[in-house]
Amino acid sequence: MLLTVTHRLLPDQWAVLAGTSALWGVVSLVAGRRLGERTVHGAAAGLTAMVGVLIPWLAIHAASTPPAELALWMIVGPVAGAICGAAGAMSRMPGRRGALAAGVVPGIVGGEAVYGLLLIGGPAWGLESVLAAGLLVVVSRRGGRLCAFGSAAVLVALAAAACLVYDSIL
């Protein structure tokens, strides 16, 4: 609900930040990181957090969004929430596994920012890229930053490609 209020309060060129699905993943990352002592608990926390973001969005946008897009988000949203929550829980782990997980959500956010910068334009996408970089620094551990940066770079490319596919389908 907070995202919807934010979307309405921000000027048009910034309002996109309240409705970007990648930034919704940050909510799931935080839930998974804070509540997930094990990966499965992080996945459950992330899924729950994403459903909490998704239900108000679906309720508010049901009349103005094509049914195919609503169905897509009802399927993809909870799965993405579980993945982001699991990545949050795993990012707390020591070693390479935790470092690789730390790059997942920042990479997704960065990929969406690249897509927005290249195809949509506007200042919000530049800010989202800065948020992705900042999130990567905060989530990654000093000793494993190179692994985290590597996984984030791969996810940037994959997320940007997924955004392109999404646009071509809907």
Task: Give residue spans per PLM region.
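Central hydrophobic cores of alpha-helical transmembrane segments
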Residues: 43-52, 101-109, 147-160
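Alpha-helical membrane segments in multi-pass integral membrane proteins
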Residues: 98-142, 151-155
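Cytoplasmic membrane-interface segments at the C-terminal ends of transmembrane helices
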Residues: 29-42, 84-101, 136-150
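Membrane-proximal helix-loop-helix units in multi-pass membrane proteins
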Residues: 55-120
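Alpha-helical transmembrane segments and their membrane-interface exit regions
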Residues: 25-27, 53-54, 77-84, 130-139, ...
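Juxtamembrane boundary at the C-terminal end of a transmembrane helix
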Residues: 159-170
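N-terminal topogenic module of multi-pass integral membrane proteins
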Residues: 1-58, 62
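Structural signature of hydrophobic alpha-helical transmembrane segments
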Residues: 10-23, 66-78, 119-130
